[in-house]
Amino acid sequence: MASRIEHRSAYSANLATTFEAVAGEAALRARLEQIGGDDAELLEYAPAGDGVRYKLRQGISSDKLPSAVRTLHRGDLIVEREQTWKAAGAGYTGTATASVSGVPGEITAKTSLTGEGERTTLVNSGEVKVRIPFVGGKLENVIAEQVTKLLEREAEFVAKWLTER
C-alpha cells in the first residue's frame, strides 16, 4: 500500500513569474544551493517550447535521518528527482518522479501551477511506494513525511525568491 503526499502552496505573484521561480534554471540552482543538502546538483535542464524538464540530485546526511530509516539504510541518502512541466490551458501541469538510493521503490506525483491575476497556486499530489516486506509501509510513511517537509521548505524558498525580485 502506498503513502500519499499532498501539498499546496500559494504565492502572491502572477503565473509567469511564479513559474520562473518554481522551474527556472537560476531559481533551481539557487534553491539547491540553499536547501538541497549534501552534494546537491542540477543534473539536467532542458527547456522545451511550452515547458521544461529537469533532473536534480539532493543529499540527506545520515545524521538528519529518522532512526527508523537509519536502522534500514546505512549512510547518507541520495535522492534523484525528475520533473516535467508543460503549458496546459491557463497554467502548467507536470509529473515528478524520485528515487532514493538503496531503497527499492519510487515516489511519483502530479503537479499543477495555476494563476489568477497576482495569485498563483502550486499543487503536488503523489504517493510513495516501498517494496520491502513487513517494514515497507512504515518506511513509506517516513519518506512521505520527509517529502512533505521538503516541499514546505521549497515553498518557503519560492516565496522568498519572489519577494526579493
Language-model features: where?
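Hydrophobic ligand-binding cavity/cleft-lining segments
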Residues: 1-62
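Hydrophobic pocket/interface hotspot
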Residues: 18-22, 124, 158
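Glycine-rich portal/gate segments that line the openings of hydrophobic small-molecule binding cavities
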Residues: 42-96
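A conserved amphipathic terminal alpha-helix motif
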Residues: 87, 136-165
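Signature of exported/secreted
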Residues: 64-68, 78-82, 113, 152, ...
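Beta-strand/loop substructures that line and gate deep hydrophobic ligand-binding cavities in soluble
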Residues: 52-55, 84, 92-144
